[in-house]
Amino acid sequence: MRILVLSDSHRDKISLMMAVKLHREADVVVFLDGEEDFQCEKMSSLLSLKEVHSVRGNCDFYSSLPSEETFACGGKTVFILHGHTRGVKHGAEELLRAAKEKCADIVLYGHTHIPKSEYIDNMYVMCPGSIRDGSYGIVDITDNGILCYTADLSREL
């Protein structure tokens, strides 16, 4: 299973569409900053066959999306959130505590705009950075394990 992870678009639909087109093979697409990013017609048509998960970000004041979500993917528990409600700009302690409470195997968060992928306390923890700046994340879940990494649109095109 492949998860494409996108965050902090700040309404840059062009970069979002480029990443989705580049990774059409992804089974799941995760948006870590709100529903407006995939509302346009072109984005919806690109994602029509994908499993999509989205949480609201710090600028999504009127969004009906949840601030956090947990879902199963490839036999693993994935915990997603934008991160601002868990203080990720000031450290990962609160984020990790919440993830442990959810029994998460994989934690995906945004808000910092800093691409980072780590293995902490038996969890894969990733911030994809900001797609507006060309940064996004990939999570591959296979029989051999989990691989989380960040990528850059400018290097992929």
Language-model features: where?
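Binuclear metal-dependent phosphoesterase catalytic core
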Residues: 2-3, 15-17, 74, 100-102, ...
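Charged helix-capping and loop-helix junction motifs
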Residues: 90-98, 123
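N-terminal active-site segment of His-dependent metallophosphoesterases
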Residues: 1-49, 60-62, 66-67, 141-144, ...
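Helix-adjacent hinge/juxtasegments
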Residues: 51-89
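Active-site environment of divalent metal-dependent phosphoester hydrolases
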Residues: 10-14, 35-40, 59-64, 86-91, ...
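Non-catalytic positions within long, well-ordered alpha-helices that form the structural scaffold/packing
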Residues: 22, 99-100
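Active-site neighborhood of phospho(di)ester-bond hydrolases with catalytic His/Asp-centered motifs
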Residues: 5-7, 28-34, 53-58, 79-82, ...
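A short helix->loop->beta-strand "cap" motif at the edges of active sites that frequently abuts
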Residues: 48-51, 123
